[in-house]
């Protein structure tokens, strides 16, 4: 079986990670004590991707939990699913990273990293045929961003031919805990560009907007935001966890989704959106799901896809529905909005259907888009970074841990290069020289 080793780092990474395990354990019929109480063979057929089968028929997540302070892990261990995880897989320090990327990456985190790698190695050795790793973390703090990216590069060194994917929570001024977020995020992106194969950008700004505008929550809490993250992660990993043909493992997903190695930052989306305690009032049909799924308001990254073009798209429908109708609806979206899909990658939209819907819904759809509009997210961080960096504000926290200003300058220019690369492919047309083919001029003008 093709296994995935899951790593969660830092407070945010551990909170969304714990939520992810709750949701998928429920979908696979795994009780909080690790016993299987499911009712369908589909639940168990590929359960080995994320779970080890221990003695006594217990299922144990292939998860490694990492933090530089004990707090978040204590609450996971004391929570409902705390007994699910292997006790040796909790690796934590005492000092904390103080929301400082340098502490996570170079000092405190670097001291703990070998202990973590030992546990990861043990998990990887227990795999029959390891396909890769997934990391949940945030880019705004110290541990998830600094130590998370350190772990990625160390894992990459040791397992160079395995796929590395990350669920990265991108900071936003709307939901801000830390004034250092733009620094931490930029330094992290600098690492992710080089060292991950696929990164799902989960943007706090977008999560906040969804809670506020769509779900009408006056004061969204992190619990509300994390609920959205967990349905998205459940949807994105459906193809990996249930039997099916399309994007059935991390490598196939990467092959379909990443046309150029640096451009591997995906925008996830989900439909229908509902608050965590509200049941969906009515079932949507396939047409409505498809329409919602492509809607900017349903995206988990605060970028408008209409400001860019899709390089590639993967869609995942869940529930009992007609395949034919799904294909028709997906074709219709592409035909009506053809200018938003680059014409130089034919068949760049892939669709999969899985019979088992998420809990509480008859059917749902998950969207993964590789769109050039994601540059808006990087521009937003870059602007905030530059505002602080040109005044050298707060830099002493980083240089005090042994960092050099040069590294900031490099990270800044790497992120700006990334933005230009997205722009370059947004403007690219099918013919090389950039000459207009006949009848193409009006289409370009309408693009502008």
Curated annotation (Swiss-Prot):
Gene Ontology MF: a single term: GTP binding
Acidic residues biased stretches: 429-448
Region feature Disordered, mapped onto this chain: 427-448
Biological process (GO), any one: microtubule-based process
Binding site for Mg(2+): 69
Binding site for GTP: 11, 69, 138, 142-144, 204, 226
Entry cofactors: Mg(2+)
Compartments where found: Cytoplasm, Cytoskeleton
Keywords, in A-Z order: Cytoplasm, Cytoskeleton, GTP-binding, Magnesium, Metal-binding, Microtubule, Nucleotide-binding
GO cellular component terms, A-Z: cytoplasm; microtubule
InterPro entries named in the record: Beta-tubulin_BS (IPR013838), Beta_tubulin (IPR002453), Tub_FtsZ_C (IPR008280), Tubulin (IPR000217), Tubulin/FtsZ-like_C (IPR037103), Tubulin/FtsZ_2-layer-sand-dom (IPR018316), Tubulin/FtsZ_GTPase_sf (IPR036525), Tubulin_C (IPR023123)
PROSITE patterns (alphabetical): TUBULIN, TUBULIN_B_AUTOREG
Function in brief: Tubulin is the major constituent of microtubules, a cylinder consisting of laterally associated linear protofilaments composed of alpha- and beta-tubulin heterodimers. Microtubules grow by the addition of GTP-tubulin dimers to the microtubule end, where a stabilizing cap forms. Below the cap, tubulin dimers are in GDP-bound state, owing to GTPase activity of alpha-tubulin.
Subunit text: Dimer of alpha and beta chains. A typical microtubule is a hollow water-filled tube with an outer diameter of 25 nm and an inner diameter of 15 nM. Alpha-beta heterodimers associate head-to-tail to form protofilaments running lengthwise along the microtubule wall with the beta-tubulin subunit facing the microtubule plus end conferring a structural polarity. Microtubules usually have 13 protofilaments but different protofilament numbers can be found in some organisms and specialized cells.
Family named by the database record: Belongs to the tubulin family.
PANTHER family given in the database record: TUBULIN
Name of this chain's protein: Tubulin beta-1 chain
